[in-house]
Amino acid sequence: MQTTVNKSNMLFCDYYKQWISVYKEGAIRPVTMNKYNMAHNWLIKLIPDLIISDLDRITYQKLLNDYAAEHERQTTMDFHHHLKCAILDAVDEGLILHDPTRKAIIKGKPYNGSVVKTKI
């Protein structure tokens, strides 16, 4: 078993990927796993260089806002929930001093109502 000596200097996107591997692989359905992996891909796109110990409320809110610029509110809420689980564990581990997800404002594009229905 390999552990990181100084996790506080770890990139948040790397911590999140490791967290998925440890806590989610083999415990959730493949469709749900895909959602966690998509969240990881968005972290790489939006905050590739963010050190985990630098994640604060303002940085987290900016991350959500950037994600919300391209997604509907419910999708942004799902993204937030996927990240929050890992972030709360990082707080418990002492890697982040305070919960940056506290009082987060969830934004997003309005629901466009375009649901694709197929006939059986």
Language model segments and positions:
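N-terminal compositionally biased, intrinsically disordered segments and leader/signal-like regions
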Residues: 4-5, 119
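N-terminal core-binding DNA-recognition domain of tyrosine site-specific recombinases/integrases
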Residues: 5-9, 13, 20-88, 92-95
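Secondary-structure junction/capping motif
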Residues: 11-15, 99-102
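Flexible interdomain linker/hinge and immediately adjacent N-terminus
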Residues: 61-65, 92-120
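Short, structured interface segments
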Residues: 1-4, 103
